Amino acid sequence: GPLGKLLKNKVENSVRHVFNFNNFRELEGPTIMPDKVWKASGHLGTFSDRIITCSKCNAVFRADKIVEEKFDVSADGFSDSKLLDFIREKKINCPSCSGRFIDKLERQSLMMKTKVAGQDASLRPETATVTYLPFIRMYQYFRKKLPFGVFQIGKAYRNEISPRQSVLRGREFTQAEGQLFIDPKEKDNWEKFDSVKEEKLPLWDYTLQDAGK
């Protein structure tokens, strides 16, 4: 409603303020692109979720979320076999009817498909890819000098299996992303690098992710 829209505008403007303060420039990219773009980016073949189906009511769920909702583990990094074994060993049943799951995982693409002039196309699942595409034009705008930063605030679309977490896992949502283009040889000499080089980010390495921690 109107109040929610006002709140959303305030959030977006706060994001804009941070980017503008750091001399990033805003751009707006297309929301629909031909599939050759998404094939090149890797989204078309790999941007998917693992799903599992109830043998009784045929309801479909994200397999990793079924595990995470019942146990304090991060299942996103589980291999397919480990995920199935976990569901089997813990006797996790369908949340809708308590039926047993079919002992098989399948992949469902998160890409929203469409047709443009008879050609296969997809709605963008994030804003980064269409920000990279006009690099040459941006490079010319910034007088062919690096580094420069750009950002985009706009809609993204994902074919979510069962979006049950309100705005956090919607099929249509607004996303903000920024990109900093810098010469790799100059990355440690960037004028603002000294102000952030001591910052520590709480990132999980691949061993912890594989362990589901």
Where in this protein do the model-derived segments appear?
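TRNA-recognition modules of translation machinery and tRNA-sensing kinases, especially anticodon-binding
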Residues: 1-213
